[in-house]
């Protein structure tokens, strides 16, 4: 005990880690017995002092950290700014989530650090502080939840919830925080139950793999070793891990410091020797590990090293395999199934920040960087090579070198303050921080129309797909508008770009029958008004009828408005044709069914000359049965001339139509069945059958009569003719003519019965054989053609039309030719005659060259009453219009086709009431996703807002241009109000938004001369060249668009500043929120420019969504999206370090080498690359051998590192050698490949690595094989003992296979001896029954190895084991 005087007295706090270190040093110095005596004394001292102190734990001991308030407030402020940026469209959802989580994680971690300092300064003897920080019970994370803040939690799917729990358990949780906490709490409860069973099963599998590993030799004689260096080329290995790695190992080589040998081969390492290596800074130390041992079925003492129990070399007969399996499996109960630790979840590796040392100006070479976005969506510069950044102060110039692939967060010439972050250094070296790809779906939070920027790739990823990829960062916009589906409507009158009344539409689409006021009351109210007053005051007041709109059924074609309203309309002469629709009352008088008239308008709205405009199918000319059509006399019908041929678009094949010149036609009915060629017909040809006779197995006849069977290509046509059969005499004249119609009055002359015919009959001669014939007299249905439907009853006359430029001609068409058979599809009826309205216009006037006219629907609303019109415009083109100086009313910038033809104004109010104005909008028509129904999007003035007037706007560059006498000015569709049709651009929607000049135009009406007030737009239209076109037709001035100043509001932590830019506002341009257009204030909404006026802008509300490259956009351009529809899918990478999958599942993934684990993703790629390169350099046999060897070394290193990383992250210490024994077993097999066929092994066979090498040496030929990673389960089922395999899993299969193969079990392992009740070959019985090969035999093998594989001597060992990452794992 004389050494006691030399010991130094320490007076400082000692925690659990320091006690462990102290015990380790005591064992090294004084041995086990003396150390245990000292520890007993420490234990007694501890109990005595704890009793005397009488520490208790109460709720008052939980002290909240004072700085928590402002820390949380600061984080909330940052989150608020982030939310604003997301709303403005500056960052997308994934960037917002990432940044939000990192803000709160940083706050939580800072609070955790403050907690320890706070306790230490204010109350060092606080029981909570002493309990947790001494390591007695509880850890920093648990105490942090008690007195700090609970922080971020994960949801049941393992994703982070970006709403943090700001309270701690001492303060108490709010209801929301409590529910969020329950996710983690429930997971914890389930964890505890499942963890024990999982850990037990893991232990069983581990022991199964290595139960036969016993120490059976002192030295295996290996020459291999693995190098460990404290100063790694990638990063410094921590001293503690370096010491843990080396202590208890055996050296594989002599260690030299200079020329002096300080340690010998096969010497075991203690703490003193390791400290000497650290002191002298030895570069690399080669040690022996279980990996280097030359046998897979046992291990030698030197390769295993010291026993952890007594500190000496392991004894012979020690069952180190079972110890290793239990050492790894037992701490499994301490591991969590899923961690709740959230650090670095969304970060891809650690990032270091470079801060400015003092205030100054930044200078760097801008050519060496290029702009990018950080993972938080902040603008930054990415540098590809080393970049020198200079910070210039008044008297100091400081230079910083930024490594490649780092982000520069400041601009050139920017002033930075001291400690401001100027760069973020990303870790450029390869680490095992594997990434996983995660999908994040963004859903629309409003309904409207989808709009892409030009940056979206319009070609979908797959054919017939609506997923579009994004090549670069851009915005997606959801333009506002309320949508309705029109699936209930058979034929919708509303077309794209029409103006409509919104309540009218909504009432129709919901429940019209529930209206309390019916159409009779509307008409009564209308007709009871004084019509003489109407001419004076303009329009009677029907404001109380605003809610009564539309008709009582769903057909949009008809509307309960009366053509007496026509005098409320005005129109320009000779260039339009208006067709008002008939009211319901008039239809009921004419007994026309509601769905009778179908108006056919082409998709593009273009009519050609003589095209069918509408048709009416009279139900009187409808038949359900098949038959033959006959005209009265063949001379009476004539086919329409070729140039007047009508194209009927209702059917796919154009049928020729015949214009009827006669008053009647005949229909001869017959029953027709078209049967497949293989049908079994149960009746004979030319036989007579009755009604309901079975023709085939499942077809019965509907009429009786004569059967006629005709066999055609691949089908049989069976006809049944009803009628009388007549066998005529030779003198009968009728029988000589076949296929004639006989009118009433003529009788059968030679028949015994003589009577006059009452109806028409059809006589048909039928000849079954050459000699025999008879006549079939068939009944005929006669159809008289009624007078044509009066056009005026269908379409009331337009009061304003002076001259009919456009004519509607009524034609009756027979849809089938003379003698042609009519065929129906299943039970559908056959229409024989169709009444068509053919559109034509004057051939004489100047517009006779027009072959096409445009048409569209117009809806006119008068104080809640609505009238629908079809407007057909005789204008040469909708793009250009020739000005006429002679007619000022027809001249102007906008063509007559583009002007709004209808406008009615009440002289009392001047402008319509605001409520009515907001109830009108423009229809945008879309196809729905299911393609079954069309959707309408209604854009009303409530979806728009106005900015202006801009009083400070200056007009620049007034250019005088000489305009020819009749110039053609091109106006594109986008030049008018965007999103509304130019044809009817100002119809109610934007009345409050536009400024008008009122001019009087005198119109001559049939009734009286009245003055009508028209309003002409005084706003400017911009053409495609960006010029503003002057609406005054007589002036030659063309203005440039005015320029507005933009102010971008930059929010900084220290100050706000404005940056002024100048731009041209053009139609269709998008604005994000918080962009200053006027000097006074930023405008508060985002949207798209709809109308540009002289001093103001009309903007349609829109919501921006930012999307970054690689995102997938769902839906098509201009498709209607509803609230909750998937808008974008982001695919982003998330770190797969020990944070998402943690604890037992992680260890299990690694040990089972599952495909979902990142080992197979990253390691396999590296292994394949290595094998290819080596095979190419060295050729096939050597390439495979060395490639397999390197592969095995690589995979072993990776597996050990990954398993240790998981355990260390949970604070569990396991010695490397235990993991190495397990990993050695799961990497000890190789797969025989097909490249080099051998006579011993089959391709695809699993054999041991050492077995393959020995066989190759014995045969003196190389066996080609590849390395394979087996999981622990698969390795357990691929051992040398079938008894061990059968007792693990799949007993019947394993035993049956072993019996078929005739396998022999040599009972070398522990388990098989236990099963059979023998002595286990471990401990005292390890050398019983074991066969030892002679020393001479061993020498022969070694000599052969030296002869054939001399390549593995000397320097080759360094090639195979040069990896210095083996023990290089982060804590």
Swiss-Prot record:
Obligatory cofactor(s): Zn(2+)
Entry EC no(s): 2.7.7.6
Transmembrane segments: none
The keyword Plastid is assigned to this record: yes
UniProt xrefs under Pfam families: RNA_pol_Rpb1_4, RNA_pol_Rpb1_5
InterPro entries: DNA-dir_RpoC2_beta_pp, RNA_pol_beta''_euk, RNA_pol_Rpb1_3_sf, RNA_pol_Rpb1_4, RNA_pol_Rpb1_5, Rpb1_funnel_sf
Predominant localisation class: plastid
Gene Ontology BP terms: DNA-templated transcription
Reactions catalysed, as given in the entry: RNA(n) + a ribonucleoside 5'-triphosphate = RNA(n+1) + diphosphate
Localization annotation: Plastid, Chloroplast
Protein name: DNA-directed RNA polymerase subunit beta''
């Amino acid at each position: 005990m004389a050494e006691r005087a030399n010991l130094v007295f320490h007076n400082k706090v000692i925690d659990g880690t320091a006690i462990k270190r102290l015990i380790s040093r005591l064992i090294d110095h004084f041995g086990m017995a003396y150390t245990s005596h000292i520890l007993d004394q420490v234990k007694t001292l501890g109990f005595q002092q704890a009793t005397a102190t009488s520490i208790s734990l109460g709720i008052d001991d939980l002290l909240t950290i004072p700085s928590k308030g402002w820390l949380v407030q600061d984080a909330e402020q940052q989150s608020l700014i982030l939310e604003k940026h997301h709303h403005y469209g500056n960052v997308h959802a994934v960037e917002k989530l990432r940044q939000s989580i990192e803000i709160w994680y940083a706050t939580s971690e800072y609070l955790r650090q403050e907690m320890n300092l706070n306790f230490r300064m204010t109350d060092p003897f606080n029981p909570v502080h002493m309990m947790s920080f001494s390591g007695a019970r509880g850890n920093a994370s648990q105490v942090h939840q008690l007195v700090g803040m609970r922080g971020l939690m994960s949801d049941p799917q393992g994703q982070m919830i970006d709403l943090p729990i700001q309270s701690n358990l001492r303060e108490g949780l709010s209801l929301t925080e409590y529910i969020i906490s329950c996710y983690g709490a429930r997971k914890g409860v389930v964890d505890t139950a499942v963890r024990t069973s999982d850990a037990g099963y893991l232990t069983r599998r581990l022991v199964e793999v290595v139960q036969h590993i016993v120490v059976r030799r002192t030295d295996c004689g290996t020459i291999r070793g693995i190098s460990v260096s404290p100063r790694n080329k990638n990063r410094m290995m921590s001293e503690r891990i370096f010491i843990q790695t080396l202590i208890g190992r055996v050296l594989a080589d002599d260690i030299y410091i200079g020329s002096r040998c300080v340690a010998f081969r096969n010497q075991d390492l203690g703490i003193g020797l390791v400290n000497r290596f650290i002191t002298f800074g030895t570069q690399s130390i080669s040690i022996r590990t279980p990996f280097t041992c030359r046998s897979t079925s046992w291990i030698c003492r030197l390769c295993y090293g010291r026993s952890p129990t007594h500190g000496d070399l392991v004894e012979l007969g020690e069952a180190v395999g079972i110890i290793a399996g239990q050492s790894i499996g037992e701490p499994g109960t301490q591991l969590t199934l899923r961690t709740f630790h959230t650090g670095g979840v969304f970060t891809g590796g650690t990032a270091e920040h470079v801060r400015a040392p003092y205030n100054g100006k930044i200078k760097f070479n801008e050519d060496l960087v290029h702009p990018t976005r950080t993972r938080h969506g902040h603008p930054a510069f990415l540098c590809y090579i080393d970049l020198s950044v200079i910070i210039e102060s008044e008297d100091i110039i400081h230079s910083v070198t930024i490594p490649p692939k780092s982000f520069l967060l400041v601009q050139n010439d920017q002033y930075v303050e001291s400690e401001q972050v100027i760069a973020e250094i990303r870790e450029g070296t390869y680490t095992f921080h594997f990434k996983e790809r995660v999908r994040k779906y963004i859903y629309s939070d409003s309904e409207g129309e989808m709009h892409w920027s030009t940056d979206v790739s319009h070609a979908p990823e797959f054919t017939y797909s609506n997923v579009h990829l994004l090549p670069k960062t851009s915005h997606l916009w959801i333009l506002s508008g309320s949508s309705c589906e029109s699936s209930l409507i058979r034929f919708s009158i509303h077309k794209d770009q029409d103006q409509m009344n919104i309540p009218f539409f909504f009432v129709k689409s919901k429940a019209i029958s529930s209206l309390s006021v019916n159409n009779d009351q509307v008409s009564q109210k209308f007709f009871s008004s004084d019509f003489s007053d109407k001419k004076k005051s303009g329009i009677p007041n029907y404001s109380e009828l605003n809610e009564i709109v539309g008709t009582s059924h769903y057909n949009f074609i008809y509307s309960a408005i009366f053509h007496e309203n026509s005098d409320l309309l005005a129109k320009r002469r000779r260039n339009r044709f208006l067709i008002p629709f008939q009211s319901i009352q008039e239809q009921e008088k004419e007994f026309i069914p509601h769905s009778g008239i179908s108006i056919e308008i082409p998709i593009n709205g273009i009519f050609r000359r003589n095209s069918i405009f509408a048709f009416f199918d009279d139900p009187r000319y409808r038949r359900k049965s098949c038959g033959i059509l006959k005209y009265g006399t063949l001379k009476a019908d004539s086919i329409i001339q070729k140039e007047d041929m009508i194209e009927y678009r209702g059917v796919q094949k154009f049928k020729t139509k015949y214009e009827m010149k006669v008053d009647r036609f005949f229909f001869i009915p017959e029953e027709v069945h078209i049967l497949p060629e293989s049908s079994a017909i149960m009746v004979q040809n030319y036989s007579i059958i009755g009604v309901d006779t079975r023709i085939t197995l499942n077809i019965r006849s509907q009429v009786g009569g004569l059967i006629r069977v005709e066999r055609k290509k691949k089908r049989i046509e069976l006809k049944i003719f009803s009628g009388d059969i007549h066998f005529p005499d030779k003198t009968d004249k009728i029988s000589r003519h076949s296929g004639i119609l006989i009118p009433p009055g003529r009788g059968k002359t030679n028949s015994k019965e003589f009577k006059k015919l009452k109806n028409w009959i059809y006589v048909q001669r039928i000849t079954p054989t050459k000699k025999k014939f008879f006549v079939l007299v068939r009944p005929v249905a006669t159809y008289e053609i009624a007078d044509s439907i009066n056009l005026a009853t269908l379409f009331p006359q337009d009061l304003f039309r002076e001259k009919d430029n456009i004519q509607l001609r009524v034609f009756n068409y027979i849809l089938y030719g003379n003698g042609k058979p009519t065929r129906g599809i299943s039970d559908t009826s056959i229409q024989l005659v169709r009444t068509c309205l053919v559109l034509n216009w004057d051939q004489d006037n100047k517009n006779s060259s027009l072959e096409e006219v445009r048409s569209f629907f117009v809806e006119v609303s008068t104080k809640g009453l609505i009238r629908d019109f079809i407007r057909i415009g005789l204008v040469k083109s909708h793009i250009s219009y020739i000005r006429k100086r002679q007619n000022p009313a027809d001249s102007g910038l906008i063509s007559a086709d583009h002007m709004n033809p209808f406008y009615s104004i009440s002289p009392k109010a001047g402008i319509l009431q605001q409520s009515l104005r907001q109830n009108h909008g423009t229809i945008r028509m879309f196809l729905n996703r299911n393609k079954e129904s069309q959707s309408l999007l209604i854009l009303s003035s409530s979806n728009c807002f106005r900015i202006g007037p801009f009083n400070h706007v200056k007009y620049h560059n007034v250019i005088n241009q000489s305009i020819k006498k009749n110039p053609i000015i091109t106006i594109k569709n986008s030049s008018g109000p965007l999103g509304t049709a130019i044809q009817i651009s100002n119809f109610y929607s934007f009345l409050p938004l536009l400024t008008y000049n009122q001019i009087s135009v005198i119109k001559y009406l049939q009734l009286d001369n009245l003055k009508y007030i028209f309003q002409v737009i005084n706003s400017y239209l911009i053409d495609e060249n960006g010029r503003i076109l002057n609406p005054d037709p007589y002036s030659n001035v063309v203005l440039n668009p005015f320029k507005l100043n933009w102010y971008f509001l930059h929010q900084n932590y220290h100050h706000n500043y404005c940056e002024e830019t100048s731009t041209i506002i053009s139609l269709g341009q998008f604005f994000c929120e918080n962009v200053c257009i006027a000097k006074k204030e930023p405008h508060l909404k985002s949207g798209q420019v709809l109308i540009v006026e002289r001093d103001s802008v009309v903007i349609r509300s829109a919501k921006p969504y930012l999307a970054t490259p690689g995102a997938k956009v769902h839906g098509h351009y201009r498709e209607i999206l509803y609230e909750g529809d998937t808008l974008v899918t982001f695919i982003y990478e998330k770190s797969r370090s020990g944070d998402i999958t943690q604890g037992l599942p992680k260890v299990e993934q690694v040990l089972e080498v599952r495909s979902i684990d990142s080992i197979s993703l990253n390691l396999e790629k590296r292994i394949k690359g290595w094998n290819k390169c080596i095979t190419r350099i060295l050729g096939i046999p050597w390439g495979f051998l060395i490639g397999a060897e390197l592969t095995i070394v690589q995979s072993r290193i990776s597996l050990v590192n990954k398993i240790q990383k998981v355990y260390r992250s949970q604070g569990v210490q396991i010695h490397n050698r235990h993991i190495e024994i397990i990993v050695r077993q799961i990497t000890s097999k190789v797969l025989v490949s097909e490249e080099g066929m051998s006579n011993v092994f089959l391709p695809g066979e699993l054999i041991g690595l050492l077995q393959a090498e020995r066989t190759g040496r014995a045969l003196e030929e190389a066996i080609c094989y590849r390395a394979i990673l087996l999981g622990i389960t698969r390795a357990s089922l691929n051992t040398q003992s079938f008894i061990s395999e059968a007792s693990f899993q799949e007993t019947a299969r394993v035993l049956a296979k072993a019996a078929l193969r005739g396998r022999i079990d040599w009972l070398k392992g522990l388990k098989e001896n236990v099963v059979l009740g023998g002595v286990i070959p471990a401990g005292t019985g390890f050398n019983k029954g074991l066969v030892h090969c002679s020393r001479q035999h061993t020498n022969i093998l070694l000599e052969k190895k030296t002869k054939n594989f001399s390549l593995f001597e000397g320097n080759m060992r360094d090639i195979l084991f040069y990896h210095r990452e083996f023990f290089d794992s982060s804590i």
